[in-house]
Amino acid sequence: MVDIYTKPDLYDAIHQNYSYDKDLITTLAEKTGGPVLELAAGTGRLAKFILDLGLEYTGIDSSDSFLSRAIHKYGDQATFLHHDMRQFHLEQCFNFIFIGFNSFLHNLTNEDASQCLQSVHNHLTDNGTFLVSIFIPDPSLLYREEDRLFPATS
């Protein structure tokens, strides 16, 4: 099995048509006027939409290969930096910070999540906006009674 998190070109190919979060993120970015910070920016899937608004964009990620791909795609139009979303220290604050595509769930412990949120707090302007995009499933879909068969549906 191929790990798409080690192959940024493959990751981009698989996710090229994902845009379910674009409208909300661009609306909030435009409303705040930037600058914009994306955590777990990966290859910069959403950077294009922010840049198209004429806003300053910074993306952080912990993957060197994904950051290299993002820098190759956007050159000096955007800033991409190697940082862990749990503990990052940048020289500026942002009017809009977001973490999309369920990436907040890479914070595997409460401590990880708390550190991430503290780092966001440290970099968000006083009237800034922070968005976390997470899929929250219906609990009834996750719970299955033991020793009970469930019909298959298509």
Task: For every predicted segment, state its role.
Residues 89-96:
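A short acidic, Gly/Pro-enriched loop at the edge of an enzyme's catalytic core
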Residues 48-87:
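Class I SAM-dependent methyltransferase SAM/SAH-binding core
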Residues 114-126:
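A short glycine-rich, Lys/Arg-flanked "PGG" loop and its adjoining helix->strand segment in the class I
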Residues 40-42:
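Class I SAM-dependent methyltransferase "Motif I" SAM/SAH-binding loop
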